[in-house]
């Protein structure tokens, strides 16, 4: 992702995954959204999720993301502590589908030391600097989810959760300094992240992945 940012030349930026698909209306949607919502720095369109074969995907992850998405499925801009709380409660964003104002993503950049939660970290940084995120349910992107992804492997191994825990505790500290008590509390508890780890424990145990069981169990109670 950092290398991609070195090629930015235009005021709007999109960094998609290798096998994700922009729908034909994506660019037009983005340009119009940026014009209509000058207070937004990040743009999240509606997303259809597909598996490695191109079929619709309805995994537990999708159901959880749908639960945490804004309940009002109309275009809206989230900002400040409200944006931080929304994302920290449960990461409902589809990172490869996001678009950004170049001045924002280049000005803030990705935090060092994160490989899995870099999207949440950047969105939280935007929120803490006063930027807004437009959520528009207009479908414009196909996001591909398959079991062989880097984040899926890290999840079963439990290694991603050490990074998540470190991130949430860092956010709790930083948001506490801003006086964002609710956001700090949500980050400190990181309930959805713990539940995610707990849901993977049976799979890790069945696979006799004892390291994964240990890592996942630690995150559930930490």
Listing of model-derived features with the role each one plays in the protein:
Residues 1-8, 21:
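Glycine-rich, basic loop-to-helix element that forms the pyrophosphate-binding segment
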Residues 6, 68-160, 164:
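Conserved nucleotide-sugar donor-binding catalytic segment
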Residues 10, 37-40, 131:
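Short, high-confidence coil segments that cap the C-terminus of an alpha-helix
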Residues 13:
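Short aromatic/hydrophobic "clamp" motif used to bind/position activated sugar donors
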Residues 18-21, 46:
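The conserved acidic donor/metal-binding loop of glycosyltransferases
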Residues 25-65:
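Conserved donor NDP-sugar-binding/catalytic core segment of glycosyltransferases
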Residues 67, 139-147, 152-180, 203, ...:
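Catalytic core of nucleotide-sugar-dependent glycosyltransferases
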């Amino acid at each position: 992702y950092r290398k991609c940012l070195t090629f930015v030349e235009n005021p709007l930026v999109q960094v998609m995954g290798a096998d994700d698909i922009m729908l034909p209306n994506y660019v037009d949607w983005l340009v119009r959204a940026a014009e209509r919502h000058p207070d937004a720095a990040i743009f999240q369109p509606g997303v259809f999720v597909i598996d490695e074969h191109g079929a619709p995907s309805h995994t537990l992850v999708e159901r959880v993301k749908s639960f945490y998405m804004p309940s009002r499925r109309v275009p809206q801009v989230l900002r400040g502590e409200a944006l931080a709380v929304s994302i920290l409660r449960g990461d409902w964003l589809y990172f490869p589908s996001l678009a950004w104002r170049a001045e924002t993503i280049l000005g803030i950049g990705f935090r060092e030391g994160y490989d899995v939660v870099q999207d949440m970290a950047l969105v939280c940084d935007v929120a803490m600097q006063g930027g807004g995120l437009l959520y528009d349910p207009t479908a414009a992107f196909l996001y591909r989810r398959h079991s062989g992804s880097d984040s899926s492997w890290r999840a079963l191994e439990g290694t991603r959760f050490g990074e998540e825990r470190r991130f949430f505790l860092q956010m709790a500290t930083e948001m506490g300094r801003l006086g964002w008590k609710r956001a700090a509390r949500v980050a400190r508890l990181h309930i959805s992240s713990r539940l995610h780890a707990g849901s993977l424990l049976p799979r890790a145990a069945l696979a006799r992945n004892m390291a994964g069981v240990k890592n996942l169990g630690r995150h559930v109670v930490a």
